[in-house]
């Protein structure tokens, strides 16, 4: 960790993968001060139809034209906010996913290039 609160490190490339382009993974450490994680209102969409996602009655919409990757989740279950609160994970979920991915790579001995990791304040 540096004097500004940035945490960074790397997982070295496995043997024979040293020339592969490094992969960078980044997440922020802080949480949104405007939302305290109470009164979280998730919206669970079973069998997503591949169209725009209306976030409850908030007037907010996740439009497929703005988020074209949504179409790839057609038929799956989506969990979103109802538009009035954060889901409570903020980027703590991002940190957990990055650390889990690195742990999995180390445990399973999956061949990989250098993995660069950074967590920002």
What are these regions (language model features)?
Residues 1-20, 30:
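A non-catalytic alpha/beta surface segment that caps or lines the substrate-entry region
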Residues 18-109, 114, 119:
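Active-site metal-coordination/substrate-binding segment of hydrolases
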Residues 6-11, 114-115, 119-121:
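Beta-rich nucleic-acid/ligand-interaction surfaces
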